[in-house]
Amino acid sequence: YDGSILSPIQHHLSINHAIYVETNRDAVESVFNRLKEFYKNVYKRPNATLMYDYIDLRENCIIVKTLVTESPLMEVDGIKVPTLEKLLVDTQKDADFDYLHGSESLNMYQLAFEQYSINTQRLMRYAKRRSISKEIQELINLSK
């Protein structure tokens, strides 16, 4: 999926031209290596330090990550993409979204709940799967 899909729920717009490729744990290495054959800026499971120091999201890049089992996905034109619920949880958990933490997190949740129909049950189920249900529940409570 394209990182710019987060723009509509951001208060302080951060440019994100990254393409995120999520695949099962066993395939991450081979997907990463295959993409490196064709593209210049490909990163495998980057941590927050790598994101801040070396990855410029204003430029095109590809970030290869492990797809968490039981992730809420939907199909668009035959391609599985993350639901908004998945993105809301992942932005709080994943190091590559560290730049969205802090006050921006609350702004994102407020805008998401104002502008979209959020399936709270799906959101909380996935948050529990990612072991951050308490944090997500706090954001939900503060955003309403």
Enumerate the language-model features and the residues they cover.
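Short gly/ser-rich loop at a beta-strand->alpha-helix junction or flexible surface loop bordering the NTP-binding
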Residues: Y1-R58
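Hydrophobic alpha-helical interaction segments
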Residues: Y39-K144
